[in-house]
Amino acid sequence: MRALRAGLTLALGAGLGAAAEHWRRREGKAPGLLGRVPLLPVVAADLPALPGGPAGGTGELAKYGLPGVAQLRSRESYVLSYDPRTRGALWVLEQLRPERLRGDGDRSACDFREDDSVHAYHRATNADYRGSGFDRGHLAAAANHRWSQRAMDDTFYLSNVAPQVPHLNQNAWNNLERYSRSLTRTYQNVYVCTGPLFLPRTEADGKSYVKYQVIGKNHVAVPTHFFKVLILEAAGGQIELRSYVMPNAPVDETIPLERFLVPIESIERASGLLFVPNILARAGNLKAITAGSK
């Protein structure tokens, strides 16, 4: 318990702390991982409001409720922040330990299912994926949570899924997931934050556009890329950071994974999340691993 609190606090920031506390008060208690995690990733839009503003303050402005707040979901095996616009997660956070990779969790007993905690207007369904040509790609991988059937079942909520090109899902991305699990043999704790990216492309007119496909009647957004950030606790207190980006396209699985390492700043800029300031605030020894580094 103490290690979980310390590690997740190392990795992640306080920006959503208020939202998490609101969620706890509303529910009376927080089930699953969220009940043990005090601080979550920072999204710029969720940072505390600046002082000032209209007379009467936010209390009067919120008389009829706010149209939306951070949608946190806590499961047995992970925590996610949900984006109702894309019908998917902004990020999913999980902790990998050797004992959690073993157990009675049986994938054949799992079924993909809607997340009933998400409003019907804003959630994906299995019908959205049917005939789309995309896999239902896990963000928190099922194989990461064999330690209980419930933990594995929770990875099959469609809120933990994104449309993924089958060749990527079954090959290069799967290799990255397997590599992440293998690091539990070397590091004391492995924290994994995974999410979608929607990156701009420069077109023939010289202008840059963010364009992405949507699938199904619920218009589930198809990411252009995916990121995975690994926060690794080594012996002696050193924290290592490895950050990867892969395109949502067929990728040659023989390409070494280190070719997909990117500076963490590029993920922070593209995703709107912040990792490094929060790690540095709690750890004096951070080593960022990038392509070609030793």
From Swiss-Prot:
Active site as annotated: 138 (proton acceptor)
Record carries keyword Metal-binding: yes
Gene3D superfamilies: Extracellular Endonuclease, subunit A
Transmembrane segments: none
Site (Essential for catalytic activity): 107
A Pfam family this chain is assigned to: Endonuclease_NS
Residues where Mg(2+) binds: 169
Any one GO molecular-function label of the UniProt entry: DNA endonuclease activity
Domain of life assignment: Eukaryota
Protein modification: GSK3-beta-mediated phosphorylation at Thr-125 is necessary for its interaction with YWHAG and the induction of autophagy.
Region of interest: Essential for deoxyribonuclease activity: 283-293
Outcome (variant: residue 110 to S): Shows a 2.1-fold higher rate for the cleavage of the 5hmC-modified DNA junction over unmodified junction, as compared to the 1.8-fold difference seen in the wild type enzyme
Annotated Gene Ontology cellular component terms: mitochondrion; perikaryon; perinuclear region of cytoplasm
Major localization listed first in the record, in broad terms: mitochondrion
PROSITE patterns cross-referenced by the UniProt entry: NUCLEASE_NON_SPEC
Transit peptide: 1-44
Enzyme Commission code(s) on record: 3.1.30.-
Keyword Nuclease: yes
A GO biological process held by the record: positive regulation of hydrogen peroxide-mediated programmed cell death
Reported impact of residue 110 to A: Loss of homodimerization and deoxyribonuclease activity. Shows a 1.3-fold higher rate for the cleavage of the 5hmC-modified DNA junction over unmodified junction, as compared to the 1.8-fold difference seen in the wild type enzyme
Enzyme class: hydrolase
Family matches, as PANTHER family: ENDONUCLEASE G, MITOCHONDRIAL, ENDONUCLEASE RELATED
Job description of the protein: Endonuclease that preferentially catalyzes the cleavage of double-stranded 5-hydroxymethylcytosine (5hmC)-modified DNA. The 5hmC-modified nucleotide does not increase the binding affinity, but instead increases the efficiency of cutting and specifies the site of cleavage for the modified DNAs. Shows significantly higher affinity for four-stranded Holliday junction over duplex and single-stranded DNAs. Promotes conservative recombination when the DNA is 5hmC-modified.
Full protein name: Endonuclease G, mitochondrial
Name of the gene: Endog
